[in-house]
C-alpha cells in the first residue's frame, strides 16, 4: 500500500479491511466455518418467522435469506446470520457486544479512585443486545417529577428514550464487526450519556 512517497506493508487485518472498503469482499456474507444451525437462538428464530409469517423450516428461511450457506457439504451461518440469530455471536465475532458503564460523578476515574458503580455487558444476537441494553439503561436513568402549569404532577425521564435509543441502534447497526478489537461502550455519567 502507498502512503505518501513510501510503500508500507499491511497486515492481514488491514488487507481484509481494505477489501471490505473497496467492496471486493462482503463481510456479512462470509461463512463462519465453525458454526452450524445449532448456534441459532430458537426464541429469536421463532419470533422472526412469526413476523414474516412463514411456515418454512428454520433452515429454509435462513438459506433463503443468505444467512445459512453450504460449504463442503455442510451448512454454516454467515457472519450476518450469526449477528442476527446466533446464541453467542461474540464467540466468533468478539466485537459483537455492548458494554454499559455507569459512573458516579462527571468523569471517568481509574485506579484507587475508580468510580464505576454499574457494569453490564450484553453479548447475545443484535436484537437481544438492543432489547437488554435498552432495559438496563432505562433502569439506570433518573426521572424527575415536577408540577406543570396545569397543576398536575408530571414525570419526565432524564433523557428522552427515543433520542438515546436511536443512538444505540445506530451504533449497533453501523458498527464495523470485522474489527475484532473494540466493542460498543455506553457511558452514563451524572451529567451526560456517551
What role is predicted for each listed range?
Residues 193-194:
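Glycine-rich/acidic phosphate-handling loop/turn and adjacent ATP-lid/helix
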Amino acid at each position: 500500500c502507498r502512503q505518501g512517497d513510501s510503500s508500507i506493508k499491511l497486515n492481514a487485518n488491514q488487507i481484509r479491511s481494505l477489501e471490505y472498503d473497496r467492496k471486493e469482499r462482503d463481510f456479512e456474507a462470509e461463512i463462519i466455518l465453525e458454526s452450524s444451525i445449532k448456534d441459532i437462538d430458537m426464541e429469536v428464530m421463532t419470533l422472526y418467522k412469526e413476523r414474516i409469517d412463514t411456515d418454512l423450516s428454520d433452515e429454509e428461511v435462513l438459506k433463503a435469506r443468505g444467512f445459512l450457506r453450504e460449504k463442503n457439504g455442510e451448512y454454516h451461518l454467515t457472519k450476518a446470520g450469526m449477528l442476527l440469530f446466533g446464541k453467542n455471536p461474540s464467540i466468533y465475532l468478539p466485537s459483537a457486544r455492548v458494554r454499559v458503564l455507569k459512573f458516579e460523578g462527571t468523569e471517568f476515574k481509574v485506579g484507587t479512585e475508580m468510580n464505576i458503580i454499574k457494569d453490564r455487558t450484553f453479548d447475545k444476537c443484535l436484537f437481544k443486545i438492543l432489547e437488554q441494553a435498552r432495559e438496563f439503561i432505562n433502569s439506570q436513568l433518573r426521572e424527575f417529577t415536577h408540577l406543570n402549569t396545569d397543576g398536575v404532577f408530571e414525570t419526565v425521564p432524564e433523557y428522552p428514550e427515543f433520542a438515546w435509543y436511536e443512538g444505540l441502534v445506530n451504533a449497533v447497526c453501523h458498527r464495523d464487526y470485522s474489527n475484532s478489537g473494540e466493542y460498543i461502550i455506553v457511558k452514563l455519567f451524572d451529567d451526560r450519556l456517551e
